[in-house]
Amino acid sequence: MAMSVHIRRLSIADLESCLAVESAAFPPAEAASREKIEYRLVTCPELCYGLFLDSTSIAPSDAADVPQSATASTNASHQNARLIAHVLSTRSLSAVVTDQDMQLPANWRNNRDKPQDSAKVGQQPNGGTVALHSLAVSPSHQKLGLGKYLMSRYIEKMREMQAVERISILTYENLVSYYEELGFQLLGASASNHGGVAWKDMVYTIDTKSD
């Protein structure tokens, strides 16, 4: 029987699950720290989504474009669902993801009541770019098409948000074609050296023209 999955917005209650997925999916030098994940879940949960494996399996009629290994659940109980993939992002004023986007404002926990746009790093609420920091899939569920499924749904969610002009990512050279299949365009080598990796800048442009 195909596994049943659902996607929902993440919250701080998902911190431990996100940390487990992130740590399993990336090398230590590249994985987001616990504090960075916490910051993103607290500061901009509307930009963070998770793919959950349900405890029950159903086969709804609207699951045609879900990977063959999974069906999209519509009315199954999600009580015991397990996070198997996530997307974590912040807003940025830059057209591409920068090292400043990945940093944390000083004393951010104590300054949560202050306007976010006063910070020079991290979440920039007036930014038109969604800086995607992590598309992470649990290793035991990789190569099943689940990452692309989550990402395609995430793009739809971002289209529905106000003042989102683009989604930008840093990715490995060998994953450029993966993101091109999702509609991202390669801009070239990134100025970021996060984790000591030669990253590539890629951008998905959101069509803001009305129908």
At which residue positions do the language-model features occur?
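Conserved acyl-donor/pantetheine-binding loop and adjacent beta-alpha core of acyl/acetyltransferases
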Residues: 60-136, 140-142, 149-152, 157, ...
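Conserved active-site alpha-helix within GNAT-family acetyltransferase domains
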Residues: 160-163, 172-197
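Short active-site oxyanion
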Residues: 6, 164-167
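Short amphipathic alpha-helix that is part of the acyltransferase structural core
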Residues: 1-36, 43, 47-105
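Conserved hydrophobic beta-strand within the GNAT/NAT acetyltransferase core sheet
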Residues: 132, 166-171
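C-terminal helix/juxtamembrane-tail motif
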Residues: 202, 206-211
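Short hydrophobic/aromatic beta-strand or adjacent loop that forms the aromatic wall/cage
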Residues: 46-48, 197-203
